[in-house]
Amino acid sequence: MKVCIYGAGAIGGWLGVALAQAGHPVSMVARGDTLRALQAEGLRMRRADGSLAQVPVTAHSDPAALGVQDLVVVAVKAPGLPDVARAMAPLIGPDTIVLTAMNGVPWWYFHRIGGPLEGTRLASVDPGDAPDDAGPHAGTRHGPP
């Protein structure tokens, strides 16, 4: 399964290491010093026991350079989501799964931001609405991107 992690912070990095160690090719969208470090050294994570996990990843600042993915994990802070939603279109194909790994994203988040994900309903637990069955961090695309 081709996996792209959009956001290489603590959550995205942890998921990237776990998925790469499970044998999936992992790419990451990052910027600045984080992008340069990923390109030079791969993804590194210090475990609780002090050991270092290091896995190779493909890293770019431009999602279009990575192509369509089987799974896209969005692991950015909530204020960055509108920009990410517009930029991630080149990663999304008809069978791509989009998984959010962030806090505070209600099911209706994409309904009025414009772009390719306009109207997408996220299956999530939302205290202001009836909970969906998917769980707190699952994203489900209903219809074309």
Model-derived features: where do they sit?
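A generic secondary-structure signal marking the coil-to-beta-strand transition
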Residues: 34, 55-56, 72
